[in-house]
Structure formats: C-alpha cells, structure tokens
Amino acid sequence: MVREEEKSRWWWFESHKSSKHSQWLQSTLAEIDAKTKAMLKLLDGNADSFAQRAETYYKKRPELISFVEDFYRAHRSLAVNFDHLKSSDHYGSRSAKVPQQSMESVCDSNSHFEDADSEIEDPLQDDASAADCKEDETWQLEQERLKLIEETDALRKQLLDKDEEKREVIRQLSLTLETLKDENLSLKRRLAHHSLKQRTVLEFKPLNKFFGKLFYIMCDGNKVL
C-alpha cells in the first residue's frame, strides 16, 4: 500500500533534500513539504457514505484553497529569487570583461610584468570558480523551479479529480433524495386511501345495526298480524 502511494506521488517523494541548498531555499522547501503533506492528508480522507464524503469535502474546501494560495506564494517567491540571481550573474559576467581586457593590453606592451601577470591569474581563477558555483546554483534553482511546476500541476489535477468525485457524490445524493420523495409521496397516498376505506366501513356499521333492528321489528309485527 505504501509503495503504491509512493509510486503515485513520485513528484513529491524524490525532491528537495540536499545539503548543497542555501538556508533560505531549504527553509522554503521545508515549508512547501509541510503544506504538501497537509494537503495530501486532506485529499486522502475517506468516508463510509456519500453523505459523509460530501460533508467532508465542503468542510475541507476552504482549507485546501488556503493551502493552494500558500503554495502559489512559495512558488512565486522561488521564481522571483531565481530571476534576480540570474540577472545578477549576467551583470557580473559583463563587468568582468573590462579588467580582463586591460590586463591583456598591459601584458602585450610590457613584457617585464609576466611574473606579476602570473600572480594576478589566481584571483581570476577564483572568480571563474565562483562563477561556476553560481552557475551550478542557478541550474539547481532552475531544476527546483521545474519540479515545483510539475508538483503544482500534479496537485491541481488531483484537486480537479477530487472535485469531480465530490460532484458525483452530490449527484448521487440528489437522485437518492428524489427517490425518497417519490416513495414517501406514494406511501402517503396509500395510507390516505386505506384510511378512507376504513372510515367508510366504520360509518356503515351503525347503519347495518339499525336496519337489522328495523327488519327484526317488522318481522315481529307481521307475526302478530
């Protein structure tokens, strides 16, 4: 049962946990994980009858909407930070070209500064390493952004499926109520008809007794004559 659940939620069980992430990214992803767990717990709630399932859905719907709003804000925050980091990298790569060109011109005009030039190469290499690290972090953020998009789409699909299921529950309840109304109306008509027949029989009983006595008196009178 657990393995089937993990397979159906591959988009969530395979994500996020890495020591290479920044503290802010780890905090954001941990918050998203907590929201995802809570949403899945709400979506997986089962009930024994159509009525209970419909009632549960309408009770949990505001909470689900709140979770989706939080999910959207977290996703938007990641996207904004990713775009900001990408823009910063672009600006840094352009500004780094100026000192590099100046260094090349100095080396061409003054051969005496070869040793000094070799000493200056170390910070440039450090800058290149830092740029590579930024590129790696940018790539990781891009992968996380794509994963978040997949997670959001999968969650939206799951919510739509649940909505359709709840609508089907409501349709079934409506049909059941209509059937009960028809049966109740039919039962009332039968009871009214049966009550009318009983009343008619009770009304005729005194008349039968009266006519019986009258017939008896008339018979006695004929005997006397």
UniProtKB/Swiss-Prot annotation:
Q: Keyword set for this entry?
A: Cell membrane, Coiled coil, Cytoplasm, Endoplasmic reticulum, Membrane
* Effect recorded for residue 211 to A: Increased association with F-actin and distorted ER network
Coiled coil (residue ranges): 139-197
Q: Which molecular function term from Gene Ontology is one that the record holds?
A: actin binding
Query: Origin, by domain of life?
Result: Eukaryota
The protein's predominant localisation is cytoplasm
Q: Which Pfam families match?
A: KIP1
Question: Where is this protein found?
Answer: Cytoplasm; Endoplasmic reticulum membrane; Cell membrane
InterPro entries under this entry? NAB (IPR011684), NET_actin-binding_domain (IPR051861)
Domain annotation NAB: ranges? 8-89
GO cellular-component terms in the record?
endoplasmic reticulum membrane; plasma membrane
Q: How does it assemble?
A: Dimer or oligomer. Interacts with PVA11/VAP27.
Swiss-Prot/TrEMBL domain comment: The C-terminus is involved in oligomerization and is essential for membrane association. The NAB domain, also called NAB (NET actin-binding) domain, is involved in F-actin binding.
> Which family does this protein fall into?
Belongs to the NET family.
Q: What does this protein do?
A: Plant-specific actin binding protein. Part of a membrane-cytoskeletal adapter complex that forms a bridge between the endoplasmic reticulum and the plasma membrane.
UniProt-recorded name of the protein: Protein NETWORKED 3C
Source lineage: Eukaryota, Viridiplantae, Streptophyta, Embryophyta, Tracheophyta
